[in-house]
């Protein structure tokens, strides 16, 4: 199943403000760019990903997207759910059977996790990867692209599950080490360092 894969990224000056106790603004912005570029490289290595879009209101990131060889879907900074609705419309316009949303702050992401998520996807269906707290959503795959409305935010895991039940479509959850950890707080940053140290 061919998909449009999108990576949502906030404006650089607003991104990762909760990391302020651990990182200066320039370091936070560099981290956001690095993670976004890494996510795009991983998506490009997955054959089922037909088109990649960077979902951002930030003009500087839009210029980087061009350099990275992906299209920019400019959202109007009204929030992640509005941005994902824009991506849903784009996937339908491209006549692609599925949409994949991968948050751009997953430092342990790998191609196998993406392939696994897409292998689980049925149509009509939803695949979601929860965060490490078991309440959020770090990856969401939808077939068809508009099978449910996006419900990112607090307790999004449960809201996406309810939406899938309401749509009477298959829902599968993927618990993956590569997908559970998103970088939001100094605690997350320390956890990533511990995981990487343990791999050496």
Curated annotation (Swiss-Prot):
Its EC number is 2.7.7.105. InterPro entries: CofC (IPR002835), Nucleotide-diphossugar_trans (IPR029044). GO terms for molecular function: GTP binding; phospholactate guanylyltransferase activity. It is an enzyme of class 2 (transferase). It catalyses: phosphoenolpyruvate + GTP + H(+) = enolpyruvoyl-2-diphospho-5'-guanosine + diphosphate. Keywords: GTP-binding, Nucleotide-binding, Nucleotidyltransferase, Plasmid, Transferase. Pathway: Cofactor biosynthesis; coenzyme F420 biosynthesis. Pfam families: CofC (PF01983). Phosphoenolpyruvate binds at residues 137, 153, 156. It comes from the Bacteria. Guanylyltransferase that catalyzes the activation of phosphoenolpyruvate (PEP) as enolpyruvoyl-2-diphospho-5'-guanosine, via the condensation of PEP with GTP. It is involved in the biosynthesis of coenzyme F420, a hydride carrier cofactor. Belongs to the CofC family. The exact nature of the substrate is currently not known. This entry has been annotated based on its similarity to Actinobacteria. HAMAP family: CofC. This is Phosphoenolpyruvate guanylyltransferase. The gene is fbiD.
